[in-house]
Amino acid sequence: MILYKREEYLKRIRGFYHDTEIIKVITGVRRCGKSSLMLTIKEELLNNGINEENCIFIDLDSRKYNTIKTDKDLEKLLDSYDNIKGIKYVFIDEIQNIQNFEEVINAFRIDGEYSIFITGSNSYLLSGELATKLTGRYIEFEIFTLSFYEYIEMKKFYKKTIDTNIISELNNYIIEGGFPKTIQYDSIIDKRTYTRAVVEEIFEKDIKKRVKVRTIETFN
């Protein structure tokens, strides 16, 4: 699938693509498009002449990598790429799935042959633990759900029908919450079902784990 380029964010990150001294940390709520943004960065590197073997995408939610659970597992995996010549561009999706990942990531940063990009849930990466353990050698790029402008442009990109009444489109945008995947669905029922599922996931996995909720019925 051809990816829509979220240029607003890409232009902020491009200057750091080849920087091996800085870890690029992409944060944002669940399903806001962090993984797709990293895939877009990888695509741009390949289009600019970087070899495929030098672009290493590790999705820790995928079957291929779901056995990688600890810092030692991650270290062993990254060590397996040592024989690749030149800078290794490493993309790690959902980094919070790895226990004590910070020291390993920092060690490979110090080696100087790795340009590292990581994504993860706000509930962990914005907790202050990241800043402490990565010793300030990172830059955070916070990603949001689609702006209304992006929402319209993305619908154009994927050749989706756009209502001639801009207010109607704005209402659709508000209902869908700006989550990129809703654009794939044609049925408003499917869009609402997906959005509700995402919001419930954010509440259960992020909000409830980090803060004490006194009036749960407010979220129902």
Can you say where each PLM-predicted feature lies in the sequence?
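Structural recognition of the conserved hydrophobic beta-strand(s) that form the central parallel beta-sheet
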Residues: 115-121, 142, 151
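Short regulatory helix/loop adjacent to the ATP-binding pocket of P-loop NTPases
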Residues: 124-140, 155-156
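Short glycine-rich substrate-engagement loop in P-loop NTPases that contacts/grips substrate
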Residues: 56-85
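Interdomain hinge/linker elements that couple catalytic modules in large macromolecular machines
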Residues: 3, 149-220
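Hydrophobic positions on the alpha1 helix immediately C-terminal to the Walker A/P-loop
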Residues: 37, 41
